[in-house]
Amino acid sequence: MNKTAICGLRAALVIVFLLILLALGALILVGNYFYTFALDPNAKGGFGSAAGIVDSEYTRWLLKDSRDVSLISDDGLELHAYRVDGSVPHRYAVLCHGYQNNATGMASYGKHLFDLGYTVLLPDARGHGESEGDYIGMGWPERRDVVRWCQQLIAEDPAAEIVLYGVSMGAATVMMASGEADLPVQVRCVIEDCGYTSVWDEFSGQLKELFGLPPFPVLNAADLVCRIRAGYSITEASALRQVERSVTPTLFIHGEEDTFVPFWMLEELYQAASCEKEKLVVPGAAHAESAAVAPELYWPAVDAFLARHMA
């Protein structure tokens, strides 16, 4: 090979190398942008709050009648929750809120259970409300926080019986917690309302809906950034896999008109669950609106489920 050919080959290799670097750099930028857009609680943007229909009357009740409690997470964050003590001894509900919301978003659910005698605990998820944290975990790191909240309740009251109750991201959180090997046996049942199968599935759907993009390569790049910045992987954050492991009776609820967390996810979750299970479909309800749209259907189903599984 003559000198000219060698120089040409070197130039071509340099160009290819630079193009690869540019492509990798572009992927990192895209991944970082998506991470900031979707998982940074302080950034403007995101997919919008999954608060459903919020009633200020219940928020006022919660803020007036509750006391503040705190917990240090496994990774050192100070987490906040509202607690309202109920009339029935040893009966507790841990209620988990949705994406870009806070504990007050679960006030109406908390009031219903409080009226049944439950002591209700409404945590602010990490990165939300008054809890520390600089990222949204979409339920995966929060599942460990839920286990810790349960352990704290049991340390105070070894005879505690607990229901985990979540809406939207909170529903994914309690499903993910239900598959943990160290979930206390005092957790008697789980109620999930419009939770997603996995973070990957949910983000894939939102990418297509909002930007017309496929998951590859955006989510792959975002997953790498998430591992670096938040310490968890989007690919491992699966409620579907966790309910396969769960032995805790679970009520699956979904609004038939939900497009934010698509209605088809209900059946996949329900079929995957290996625990004792029930299902409630709410006609006409969009995302996180089932209780408000059809209270005459919703609350009797919830109450009957609780009556079967809480002493």
For the regions a protein language model found, what residue spans apply to each?
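Alpha/beta-hydrolase active-site loop
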Residues: G105, I136-D157
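Catalytic histidine-centered segment of alpha/beta-hydrolase-like enzymes
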Residues: A285-W299
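An N-terminal hydrophobic leader/cap segment in hydrolases
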Residues: V16-I72
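Hydrolase active-site cap/lid region
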Residues: M176-S233, R241
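Conserved alpha/beta-hydrolase
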Residues: G110-E132
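Short alpha-helix in the alpha/beta-hydrolase fold that links the catalytic acid
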Residues: A239, T248, P262-Q271
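Acidic catalytic loop of the alpha/beta-hydrolase fold
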Residues: E256-V261, A288-E289
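Short beta-strand/loop motif that positions the catalytic acidic residue
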Residues: R245-V247, F252-H254, D258
